Amino acid sequence: DAVKAAGGGTLYLPAGRYLVDQPIKVPAGVELRGSWDVQHHTQSGGTALFTNYDGGATGESGASLIQLEAGAGIRGIMLAQLNIASDGFTAANPRKTPFMIQGQGPKVYIINVTIAVGDKGIDLASYDTSGHYVDYLGGVPLRAGIWVGGGAEGGFIRNMQLNPHYGSRLPEGGQGYPRVSMMRFVQSNCSALKFADVKNQTIFNNFVYGSVYGIHFLKDAITGKYPGKMTVIGHGSDGCTYSLFVEDADKDTKIVAINSELVNTQIPNEPVRSYVLMGDKVNTDKVHPNAKLVLYNSAFWGSPVFGAIINNGIVSFQQANFTRSGQGVDVRGGKAHVYTSYFAQRMGRAATGDDGYAKLGEQGKSIELTNNYYVSGFRFSKAGTGLIYGSDKK
């Protein structure tokens, strides 16, 4: 408040560990700044805010620990939830808390911030944070990474990395940081990146390791609007159950992903995994038949059960590399187009119900397969009256 009263500026916290057990509001025009000028890891130490704050009587719906008013920012700081897995809570059942950081107006920014461990990361969905800027976030949020919506326009999410090893690779001697191994939990409980009602959003060069949904598009809980047109460049989801999930989309939704790396790993308690999931069930009314997802120059690898599950809408793949495709591009509803792509998984016999590089289900409308290469030859299976067509179908 003193910095605000002086006309705004920077409140600098030198390297060290600070205990903060009550929410902090950073006023408009003020930056809360720590010792780091670059992205950093838990094991590097520096300026850190430790907390036991869990929302108090209102729990996870309580106020965020760090609240950024319009034009405020936080930079160069580590955050750590000390009691995430203590006092009756464990790595298998961690404590639920509010988001650690919340933007409460336009032009908020979060730069070079690391969440050593926390339940939820950054809330940019509860308010209109148009012009928000997030750059070089790292850490291991357990249930939510960055959630964006609220009608925000012209925001940037760039160069972030979420990975469970932030919770287990600590500075020399530990220095009071909680040591937690959260891989299995985040793979079954975390939604790392959520985008709802946003416009002209820049989503660039981000990486998520370990999550149910690596990047997730859905209807906005505040405005009731759907994702619009947006472009995602250089996104990576690794170790995920569903690397990219479109849960809600209307007729104007068009999501274009360029140079994506979408990876599944074999997760014992997640029996169904796919690189892409379009809609949560066959012919879901949450995804409009004309909603579009377009992927250019994608790398798919790992241990999928299905290469893609398409329940509604229109999904297009151009120049995709399916190192492994599982049971193929499974069009259960809606339409798919696959162009100039490479299916590298070898198959030992002719396609049956669960084999092949492409499947068209009983309620699937169509799949176009054109100019693709299949290492074991063109294999597909079809049920119902939908259409399989394209230059690959002789």
Task: List PLM regions with ranges.
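Short glycine/acidic-rich loop motifs that flank beta-strands on beta-rich extracellular proteins
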Residues: 21-23, 42-45, 54, 62, ...
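A structural signal for beta-strand register positions
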Residues: 36, 78, 83, 114, ...
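Beta-strand repeat architectures
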Residues: 2-10, 361-367, 382-384, 391
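Detector for repetitive beta-architecture
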Residues: 8-10, 15-17, 23, 29-31, ...
